[in-house]
Amino acid sequence: VMAVPYDMYISGYDTDAVNKLVLWSAKSPNNLDMTAFSRGEYVRSLEENTMAEVISKILYPADDHIEGKRLRIKQQYLLVSASLQSILLKHIKKYKTLDNLPDKVAIHINDTHPALCVPELTRILIDEYGYDWDKAWDIVTRTLTYTNHTVMSEALERWPESLFSAELPRIYQIVLEINRRLVQKLNEVYPGDIAKIEYMSPVAHGEVRMANLCLAACHK
C-alpha cells in the first residue's frame, strides 16, 4: 500500500502566513491486475486497488466488529507512518542528520488515535536509519508529546494483543521491548507491587494500551 499526499494550503486571517495541511490517500502500487482482467475477471482485477483505497475512504470506521478493528488499525498505521516518513525525509534533506530532530521538530500525539507514532518512529530510526535502541529511544522521547482528552478509562484506546500482533508484527515487537524496559524500571520503583506495575504497563492482560504507551515515551 502506498500513501499519496495531498497538500492543502490554508491562509491565515489578516496575515501573510500560509500553513500546509497534508491529507493522505491509500493507493495500491498496482492499479489493475492484468492477469485477472485478461481472464475476464474484471471485478477481481480491481480488488487489490479497491481494498487499499478502503483504508483511507472513511476516517474512524466503526470498530464494533473484528473487520472494523482491522481496518481502523490499518488506517491509523498508514496515517502515522506516512506522516512520520514525510517529516523525517524533509528533516534529512535540510539537516543531513536526525540527531538534532528533537531540537527542530515537535510531534504531538493528540489523543490516542495517533499513538502508533511511538513504536513507528522507533522502528524507522532503528530499521531504516540504523540507530541503536538507546539512541533511537532518546530521540523518540525528546521529540514526542501527548495530550489526553478524557479521564474515562473506557474511552482510552486499547487493542486486543492478538489483533495487534497479527496486523503489525514488527510494531508489536517494538511495543513489547518498550513494555519490557518500562516494567524493569517500574519494578525498581515499586518492587513487588504487581497490580500497580500491570496498571501502568503498555501491554497487560492481553491488551495493548495506547495511552500507557504514550505516557511511557512522551516527555510532555
Q: Across the structure, where does each feature detected by a protein language model lie?
A:
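A conserved ligand/cofactor-binding region detector
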Residues: 1-220
